[in-house]
Amino acid sequence: MKKKWLAAALAGILLAAAVLSGCASTEKAKRLRFGVAGEGGIYREFGERFAALENETDNGQVELKATAGSAANLRLLTGEYLQLAIAQADLVQDAYDQTGIFADEEEDRGFGAVAALYTETCQVVVRADSDIRSIEDLHGRTVSIGAEESGSEQNALQILSAYGLNDKMVSMVNLNYEDAAAQLKAGRVDAIFMTVGAPSPVLTALAGECDIRLLKVDGAAAQRLMSAYSAYNTVTLPAGTYPGQTEEVQTVGVKAVLLASSALPAKQVQQLTQLLFSSREGLEEQLGIPLDPEENAVEGVGIPFHAGAAAYYKAAGITVDQTAGN
């Protein structure tokens, strides 16, 4: 009898351990590290608000990870440290195709698109009392090109190159958005590049503290840029986007894309996609920028979609190229 009791007890313990182990494994699988960026950008603001929505569901608990931006997010997503990330469409395509700054990297690109979220505008800003009137005038000046490993850095280098400028002609420094704004206000840098949804809270705050002017990215240089890099499109910043801005400004922009790891189950990503679009209007109000609806969220992405996102779009009557997921 005693042996039978011990055997039964042992079996019960093993069963409980297996159940607990399974629960722990499931819990771990549902924990989602979400790569955003540092303070002052829309990536961080979007991530905070979307994570709050997701954490109210039983689909997964989101943990935000602050990074330098797009390039860093793509490397961390490829390395399976992140399960979700936001990145600029131009760098997303480079990472997926292993071109550009990702040309020498051999890792498999284990991710798919969820949605294009909004257009990020390339904004080149100087003080209003500066004698800098065009990108060409940045020759011989000190310019913040964004944080190292950020999308802004790559866009700044590409835009400067389109105007015939390089690091021998321009003194380039890597600063995050908030530090760049502070340095411009103090007169320690002559211009700052920011690729971010407009209006940017950092630039709005800066314009309230000192008068600023936005430089145009247009004409033949913009055409060269868009011919060389298909992810760029033309953007017009309306007058009044920022305090003191009395005229519209022509520039270029790229899509910000939400990405998911191939390791995430299709059902989980489908639920995330559903949450994104069912919450779109509320997110727009909180962020102060328009988010793409379903029909626009599949454009300008440049890579196939995660199987879970593809399932969501199929149910909405939209067909997309699919990769990744199970």
What is the predicted role of each segment?
Residues 1-10:
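Bacterial N-terminal signal peptides that target proteins for export
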Residues 19-22:
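C-terminal motif of bacterial Sec signal peptides marking the signal peptidase cleavage site
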Residues 24-26:
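Bacterial signal peptide processing site
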Residues 29-62, 120-186, 299, 303-308:
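Bilobed "Venus flytrap"/periplasmic-binding protein-like clamshell domains
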Residues 41-78, 84-85, 245-246:
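Extracytoplasmic small-molecule ligand-binding "clamshell" domains
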Residues 89-91, 98-102, 130, 167-258:
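Pocket-lining segment of extracytoplasmic ligand-binding domains
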Residues 104-117, 122, 241-250:
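A structural signal for short loop-to-beta-strand junctions that line the ligand-binding cleft
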Residues 175, 179, 186, 196-214, ...:
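An extracytoplasmic/periplasmic, membrane-proximal ligand-sensing/linker region
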